């Protein structure tokens, strides 16, 4: 089925006389006739629902739609994109393990990996996304369990060479996780290029209106966990908390990863998306394919205007022919990338501050990727926790402005940008 149709009708097919829109199952619990029936659910011997902290029918319908969009075999929703990335990584790693990650990832995820997970005994090596195959290979250690990157990094807007990173990961017997938030599956499907797990902050383009927080995790169903059983004991050895179930044996490579993440991590951490948020997310998904076209068109128009302006020192947008990532964008993102543009002003950080203050249509917000245009200075906000060396490695200099182009008229956006630049 075409992705446009999946956006509108995927995940839920109503029967005769049933609601045309997905129902909101706003219930914490579910009734069963016997304790034996419920016991089968707790033993993972039957499908169904017993507590919405782990699973909920509304959430599962939306997860199924996103899974269909990405071309995966299993999926789950989480309360936020940050929760999705944590679950995806922690589902594979434990104390003593190691992660290889792109250095230009979102600041919150960088902090998650470099600080919070370090406290859990999990270390990481960060690599330049444009590193050579030899440099990438050198980052691996005997205890490396996963490779992580973003299709389009936030806010440096670097493009991940998914095939290169997948090849390296698989050569070392570990999966590649790709955060596909910015392009969405409308513009890129990382599974088609070798990724094994895909994550999303559904708060961004999927919701599209700055209304609901959420995240999602999808499994390609292609990574053979049992072939690397020594690396992934959590998937390939009995789980004492579920009467000795071995996930990779019981659910196969198509379902083991998501089942474990749901049964263990969602059970213990409780980062479940609410049914109401899932319902509103689905409303956003129904127009995702249409909105992404406008976001990309506006992003390109703004990027071209900025590139030609004398007060702009540089522009990061992979759609521009001048971008060092343009060839990768043509390969992985032939239909467009996203509506986010980042750029540096010739006057430095002070000029960036003045520019943002003078904007009329674009609001200064920490958010990104919704219907309304917004901007921020990442070095003083989303990446504030990084030191100067880390900021440089992440591609986030002090003067950088990140602008998320919304659905307004591109002419109005450019006029607003022009008048703000005139005030510098």
Locations of regions flagged by a protein language model:
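PLP-dependent enzyme catalytic core of the Aspartate aminotransferase-like
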Residues: 1, 114, 123-124, 138, ...
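N-terminal "arm"/small-domain region of PLP-dependent enzymes with the aminotransferase-like
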Residues: 1-56, 64
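Conserved PLP-enzyme active-site core in the AAT-like
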Residues: 7-13, 75-308
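Short Gly/Pro-enriched turn/cap motifs at secondary-structure boundaries
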Residues: 14-16, 206, 270, 331-333, ...
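Short loop segments at secondary-structure junctions
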Residues: 29, 220-223, 345-348
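Conserved N-terminal alpha-helix of the aminotransferase class I/II PLP-enzyme fold
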Residues: 34-86, 108-116
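Short amphipathic alpha-helical segments
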Residues: 47, 73, 277, 281, ...
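Conserved C-terminal alpha-helix-loop-beta "cap" of PLP-dependent enzymes
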Residues: 292, 300, 304-307, 311-401, ...
């Amino acid at each position: 089925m075409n992705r446009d149709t999946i956006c509108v009708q995927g995940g839920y097919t109503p029967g005769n006389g049933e609601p045309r829109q997905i129902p909101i199952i706003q219930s914490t619990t579910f009734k069963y006739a016997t304790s034996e029936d419920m016991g089968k659910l707790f033993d993972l011997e039957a499908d169904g629902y017993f507590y919405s902290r782990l699973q909920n029918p509304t959430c599962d319908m939306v997860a199924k739609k996103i899974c269909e969009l990405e071309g995966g075999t299993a999926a789950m929703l989480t309360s936020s994109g940050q929760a999705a990335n944590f679950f995806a990584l922690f589902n594979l790693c434990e104390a003593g393990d190691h992660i290889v990650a792109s250095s230009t990832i979102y600041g919150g995820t960088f902090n998650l990996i470099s600080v919070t997970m370090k406290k859990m005994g999990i270390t990481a090596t960060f690599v330049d996304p444009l590193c050579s195959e030899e440099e990438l290979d050198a980052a691996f250690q005997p205890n490396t369990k996963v490779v992580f990157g973003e299709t389009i990094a936030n806010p440096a807007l670097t493009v991940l060479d998914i095939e290169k990173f997948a090849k390296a990961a698989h050569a070392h017997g570990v999966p590649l996780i790709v955060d596909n938030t910015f392009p969405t599956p409308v513009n890129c499907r990382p599974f088609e290029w070798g990724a094994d797990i895909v994550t999303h902050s559904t708060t961004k383009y999927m919701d599209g209106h700055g209304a609901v927080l959420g995240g999602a995790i999808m499994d390609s169903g292609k990574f053979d966990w049992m072939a690397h059983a020594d690396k992934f004991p959590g998937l390939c050895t009995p789980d004492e908390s579920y009467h000795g179930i071995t996930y990779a044996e019981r659910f196969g490579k198509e379902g083991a990863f998501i089942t474990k993440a749901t049964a263990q991590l969602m059970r213990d951490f409780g980062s479940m998306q609410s049914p109401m948020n899932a319902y509103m997310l689905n409303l956003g998904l129904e127009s995702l394919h249409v909105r992404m076209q406008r976001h990309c068109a506006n992003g390109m128009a703004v990027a071209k205007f900025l590139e030609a302006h004398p007060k702009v020192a540089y522009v990061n947008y992979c759609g521009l022919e001048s971008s060092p990532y343009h060839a990768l964008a043509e390969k992985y993102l032939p239909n467009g990338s996203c509506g986010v543009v980042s750029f540096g002003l010739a006057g430095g950080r002070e000029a960036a501050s003045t520019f943002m203050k003078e904007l009329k249509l674009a609001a200064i917000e920490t958010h990104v990727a919704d219907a309304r245009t917004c901007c921020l200075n990442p070095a003083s906000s989303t990446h504030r926790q990084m030191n100067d060396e880390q900021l440089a490695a992440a591609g986030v200099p002090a003067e950088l402005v990140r602008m998320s182009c919304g659905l307004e008229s591109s002419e109005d956006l450019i006029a607003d940008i022009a008048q703000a630049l005139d005030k510098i």
